[in-house]
Amino acid sequence: MHFDDLPVLPASPGVYIFRRGGTPIYIGKAVNLRSRVAQHFKAGGKSGKFTALADSLDFITTRNEVEALILEANLIKQHRPHYNVLLKDDKHYPFLKLTNEAFPMLVVTRRVLKDGASYYGPYPDASAVRRVKHLIDTMFPLRKNSGLPMQKKPRPCLNYHMGRCLGPCVDAADPQAYAQVVEDVKALLEGRAAPVIARLKADMQAAARAQDFEQAARLRDRVQAVEKLFGTEQHAYVSEETDLDFLGVAQAGEYAMVQLFRLRGGRVVGRDKRFLVGAEGGADVGEVLGAFVQDYYTQATHVPPLILLPAEFEDAPVWSAFLSERAGRRVEMRTPKRGDKAELVEMAQRNAAAGLESELALLERRGDHPGLDALREVLALPDRPWRIEGYDNSNLFGSNIVSGMVVFEGGRARRSEHRRFKVRGLDHPDDYAAMHQTITRRLTGSLADKLPLPDLILIDGGRGQVHAALDALRAADVRVPLVGLAKREERIILPGRFGAQWWLETGTEVGVGGELLLPHTHPALRVLIGVRDEVHHYAVSYHRTLRGEQMLRSVFDDLPGIGQKRRDALLEHFTSLEDLAAAPVERIAAVPGMNLRAAQSVKKFLAERTANGTPT
């Protein structure tokens, strides 16, 4: 597998799965999926082997690293991938153990005994488990030494004096307070961070009201540490040991992604997903779910007693009855509204959205851009808009009025064909006149012979800018599809009385027609936003460059003892006042035509400007 064949990965925590022929050969977890997977392709050794053998990569996003650890462990146990050889046997996995004592302590162990202790795991990443233990040891005052009760009472240790232990070994611990700490640690390790955070915040506020600011500060640090590592809730499992499937759906135009997670014994052990095409034309979430259920569950070898859905669909009762008869027991389809099960569905929804975005980006990268087909359909274009040109203006109170033109082909920027225009003959802000002039120069000047006509023109602006561009098209006798994109609500401005089809109507009087508002995830809108953002940045950066050059020239005109040749030489070597002011005297003196005396004069002049409050 090559790096260029990877799906577009999010920069978020999760689990990634290298597969060969559909079989997992390596499963790993990451705090940042994008960075971690990229590292495998740069490394040699074992990473080089499984990246070379893999023919696909899959990923599951999680809320935090702890959840990723748990999910990774369950998937490795389920699939036993070849290149996770060191982690295959459960007896080698590290567990976190809360001992069964009057004052429990937290330890890392690789043996699970029937000793009444509470075990959490297994975890395949020993270093990450130690980090979790270190955080709990630092922030929760559990005892750190073993062997209670002691024959001889020791002196209080450093942890006690630092507030990191309640001191049971010196009989200083309140059993009730210690029990509360133990309950907090259990809740965190079971994935119930939210109530712990809420209680810690309440205790912190109470300490502050009592003016015990040292204790309030400790509690504040504890809250921040818990929120950073655990988030507000864990979602990789539920507390009860149950079997169920939970589904998530994401849609973008005619494309949809359904992801199904299998939860067995209260823990996620696997996932299936489908990338669906043809969901356009009014298909709602229920219809997409119905199509997936029909495809998946008619082939499934095991159906759990409960299937959680993000939305209801019309045939759910029929499918529930069919699957119940097939399984020989009741199979329920439910749409949870609150609680643990609703949060499982929310996890599936997030992963479906991330998976859909990844699939769409991969299609775009391979040239099979779904947004171009969506644009053709939405705008009733005669052809797929392979080449799109975007236009925007930039100025500050009418000075240095410029326009930018960017070119996209196949959904990707073609920066070698981007162009910048200095708007001529305008000394006051007039966005409409600037747009008219820019379109006219593009269609009738030298660029008309150098560049092919686009399949679509996008104007960054509202009705006024679109009308000005249409006038320029009409004057140049060019009929190219044109739309605007207004920043407010990302509204698409359509030309012509006959909606978006004016370019198909010969003899139609051109004017601004209606507006179109698409969902933000719609592939067509994604394309237009990408072009708009590129041209806006391009025009603004050009305007800033001209503004800086103008300011630099005006300052150079005032430099004492610096003639025209030296000014031109300095302008060639220094692109901004900041660059010139920061340069040492020796660098300025090295500019052709300059000498040490002239350079010192320049530095002195700029220093005086700064001292007088004039910005450089």
Curated annotation (Swiss-Prot):
BP-aspect Gene Ontology terms: nucleotide-excision repair; SOS response
SUPFAM superfamilies to which the protein is assigned, alphabetical: C-terminal UvrC-binding domain of UvrB (SSF46600), GIY-YIG endonuclease (SSF82771), RuvA domain 2-like (SSF47781)
Domain UVR: 194-229
Protein keywords: Cytoplasm, DNA damage, DNA excision, DNA repair, Excision nuclease, SOS response
GO molecular function: DNA binding; excinuclease ABC activity
Chief location category: cytoplasm
Domain GIY-YIG: 11-85
Subcellular compartments: Cytoplasm
Any GO CC annotation of this UniProt entry: cytoplasm
Listed Pfam families: GIY-YIG (PF01541), HHH_5 (PF14520), UVR (PF02151), UvrC_RNaseH (PF22920), UvrC_RNaseH_dom (PF08459)
Complex and partners: Interacts with UvrB in an incision complex.
Function description: The UvrABC repair system catalyzes the recognition and processing of DNA lesions. UvrC both incises the 5' and 3' sides of the lesion. The N-terminal half is responsible for the 3' incision and the C-terminal half is responsible for the 5' incision.
Family label: Belongs to the UvrC family.
Database matches in NCBIfam families: uvrC
Protein name per Swiss-Prot or TrEMBL: UvrABC system protein C
The organism of origin for this protein: Deinococcus geothermalis (strain DSM 11300 / CIP 105573 / AG-3a)
